[in-house]
Amino acid sequence: MPVYSIAESLIAWLGDSGHAAYHIAPPAEDAPTEFVTVERTGGYVADKVDHPSVAIQCWAATDTDAERLAITIRNLVELGARPEGVGHMAINSGPYAFYDEETRMPRYQLYVDIACQLTD
């Protein structure tokens, strides 16, 4: 039985929505002007349903653009069609500024609570 990856599903879903999305931020020289990273940060399983908590980080050249991208992603989560295998998505917190000291690139983050299948 194949394992369902919420991170892979969200990355594909965001890509299909026109947003460059990755597990890990690409090197600065290879990165698009705006992109999104997706990371499962926790969660639990109950009654054969996976309930992952996911951090979505929105990166851009300026703080304003990073915030706008985060708001766009927030609206997609709340108002858009769900990725295949996902029954529920809701913003837990964010978007909020989450500046990256290492790359010095503006970044906003939001946390999403999800209910999804355990397997494909």
Region spans (language model):
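Short amphipathic alpha-helical segments
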Residues: 52-55
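Small/polar-rich, solvent-exposed N-terminal microdomains that initiate assembly or binding
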Residues: 1-46, 64, 68, 75, ...
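Short, charged interaction patches at domain edges and termini
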Residues: 1-12, 29-30, 41-49, 89-120
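Short hydrophobic/aromatic beta-strand micro-patches
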Residues: 57-59, 115
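Charge-rich, low-complexity amphipathic helices
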Residues: 36, 60, 95-99
